[in-house]
Amino acid sequence: MARIGILKVRGAMPHYEELPFNIYVDESGMIRDLDALIIPPGTLVESKVLERYGWLGREVWDFVERGGTVVGVCSGVQFLSKSINLNVRGLPGYVEGLGVLNISLEPLIVTGPVLVKVINESWATRGLVNTELGGWQAHTYGKINVLNNDVQIDGVSTITRYNYRNATLETPTLVSSRKYRVFGTMVHGILGPNSPISKNLFNELGIHDERIIREYYKLSDERAWAPREDAPRIPRIITVASTMTGEGKTLLTSALVHCLSREGYYVGVAKLGGDIRDLHPSLYVLKRPFKPWMSIMLRWDDKALGWVGWREALSNAAGLGLDYLVVEGVMGLLTGSSRDSEDVFSSTIGFMKQVGTDVILIASAAYDGVEGAIFRLRSYIKELIEIGRKPIIAVLNNMYHGTHEDEEVVRFRRELEGLSILLMTIDALPISSKPEELIDLGDYEEAAVKISEESLCEHLIGSLGQS
């Protein structure tokens, strides 16, 4: 049986989507014996895998130069590229990729479904010119620049929303090497068992039997979202909200799913709005794939931000028999609430009014100090109580300590105890990653596990039992 390996190192997400493989590559000496290698999505560049694993670059190059077949997906394309500009907000900050594909990547934020049109033929796109394939993109650094004739553009995506604005853009998303047997896609979801590109890959390996092809997805299937025997059942929903954007919702969500999963619960995760990058840390922790129902639609005037309506999302969660669905809010609790109506919602608080949900509210002391964070928590808790959504836990993130600050926290804790709300504090962690930029998923997982195991899990299970 042909050996198709998939890279499984820090920052790699081999289970993010259906991909064909039957071997995990996680140590030196494994690549040379493969027939094909998949470089999966994730945060391979941000996780500095070429530096962390000294053998990796050398062994991939040796494999490529011996005629090995390589497929890179999203972060895998960045890994194979010549350079990546990781600075999305200021001056260029280029880091080197492996250089197998003579391309560079620049910041381009895309987080939604796309159609990619095949425009040129390579071994991967043979027989597909002028056809369209449906998938999705979820990246921060996705603008491909071809640097010389060694690389061919095989496909172009038509994007209707990018860089947080609604506008149309056509951009290269499928590329192949004219020099090596290397193909890259920035589009997810086009390498499943029924994909014509996958069939071309299997043809290259001399595999034509559909039953054998299905065998290469067994490891992927092991982490699929499968319905439980007692499904459908209504999951308990926990919504993670913050007083402002950037206060730690994504990290807290990751810690929650780690805790609940560790306790033996079947737990899913979803995001209000369309920025599905915020789901990646939780999916990395769970080692499960992204699905469209995880992006819950908000209405913004006549535009939809997100993929599916909340009823469809919850129906999918119930159909799986999930015990818990953890939903990360969008920006601050009240952001967009002036657009809410009885029929549709544009905000986190609007979602809470529509859906029966437990609430965990977080505020960060990094912006205006412990005092400011407590003031915001107090104000927003009052607002939530008024709509019948009293938080089960309030989280003071990025806590720092001083005599007066600690006394203020003690007073606030007593105040919340009178409301049967638990106050949890999280000291500032040495983590530089951000969900939308420069995120090392391994770094995020370590921080989430630390929060979960040191304090959150014990408090969470107790609070859920009381509410």
State where each predicted segment sits.
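A glycine-centered loop/beta-turn motif at secondary-structure junctions
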Residues: 161-206
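Pocket-forming structural segment of enzyme catalytic cores
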Residues: 88-175
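N-terminal beta1-alpha1 cap of cysteine-dependent amidohydrolase-like domains
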Residues: 1-65, 75, 85, 106, ...
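Glycine/small-residue-rich loop that forms an oxyanion/phosphate-binding "nest" at active or ligand-binding sites
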Residues: 75, 81-93, 336
